[in-house]
A protein has these predicted regions:
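Membrane-interface alpha-helices at helix entry/exit sites of multi-pass transporters
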Residues: 93-107
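Transmembrane helix boundary and interhelical loop/hinge segments in multi-pass membrane proteins
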Residues: 47-52, 68-90, 102
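Terminal transmembrane helical anchor/hairpin motif
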Residues: 37, 41, 180-259, 263
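Secretory targeting signals
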Residues: 34-66, 104-165
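Hydrophobic/aromatic residues in alpha-helical transmembrane segments
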Residues: 64-71, 119, 153, 169, ...
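Hydrophobic alpha-helical transmembrane segments
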Residues: 1-61, 65-66, 99, 136-141, 168-169, 235-275, ...
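Central hydrophobic cores of alpha-helical transmembrane segments
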Residues: 25-28, 168-178
Length: 275
């Protein structure tokens, strides 16, 4: 059994467990609801681009936890049950198992997110009569990449852990640390350096710190896509944007968060005693 075979099996198993359709339904429902929010806020002018921005904000919170749930037991669950020893006896290498499970689970999450966003795109057209295609396609692709990044994190966690309970603990910690609590660190650094909390205009390094998490990088890229790559940043820092705030830098951060956990997970998994 090779990694493509493992990837296909992971994808088929996810279809059988309705994981794909759960992702589609949840993302379609939440992003479609966000598309109509501007109609309910009197101070906000109804606009399809604003609706896409709202959908990306919902996605930044929902996608990480969905991707982690989809993948955190991919290796740890089979390791605890003993079925992983059977799989490794077929025989794929441990690296092939990790790559196959990442591609299979990552494919399920990415396809589910794309389908969910397509539904919300139809809803947006129905509400606003049109859709800014470039912004929509770009946001959809970024959201799929965010999902794949957290699948990489989840597979890395799963490869490093021997039990379901430990994998779950680390997955929850990753979600809290990289999504809900990350901004506390840049704000605390700003307070220590300047003696005050961030205001309307902030130093450029603060935006870099905020964007060092996969969710922060996603938010920075989505904002650049919807508002213009330089406009939003220059307004926030009150001057020209340095090179390290270029969208390419944040894209690289997301790719690092996708691949580095896999490498770390593989190094631990390669030495693990499965007996």
């Amino acid at each position: 059994m090779t990694w493509p075979t493992i990837a296909r099996k992971e994808f088929a198993d996810a279809l059988g467990s309705r994981m794909l359709w759960a992702i589609v339904i949840i993302i379609a429902l939440m992003t479609s609801l966000s598309a109509g929010l501007s109609l309910l806020i009197p101070e906000m002018e109804p606009d399809a681009a604003v609706a896409i921005g709202g959908a990306s904000q919902f996605a930044a919170l929902l996608v990480p936890i969905m991707a982690l749930i989809a993948a955190y037991l991919a290796i740890a669950g089979e390791r605890e049950s003993g079925s992983l020893k059977v799989l490794l006896g077929l025989p794929p290498s441990r690296g092939e198992v990790l790559v196959g499970k990442f591609l299979g689970r990552g494919g399920v999450v990415a396809i589910g997110l794309v389908l969910g966003f397509l539904v919300s795109g139809v809803v947006t057209v129905a509400i606003y009569g049109g859709l800014p295609l470039t912004a929509f396609v770009g946001t959809t692709a970024l959201t799929a990449l965010l999902g794949v990044s957290f699948v990489g994190i989840a597979i890395g966690i799963s490869a490093l852990t021997a039990t379901r309970a430990r994998a779950m603990t680390l997955a929850i910690t990753a979600y809290l640390g990289l999504t809900l609590l990350w901004d506390l660190v840049p704000n605390a650094v700003h307070l220590l350096v300047t003696g005050e909390m961030p205001g309307q205009v902030v130093p450029a390094w603060l935006l870099l710190l905020q964007g060092l998490s996969p969710t922060g990088a996603y938010n920075a890229l989505a904002q650049a896509l919807l508002l213009g790559s330089g406009t939003a940043v220059e307004a926030r820092i009150g001057g020209p944007a340095p090179a390290y705030l270029h969208p390419g830098a944040f894209l690289a951060i997301m790719l690092v968060w996708t691949l580095l956990p896999l490498v770390v997970g593989y190094l631990g998994f390669r030495r693990a005693d499965l007996s």
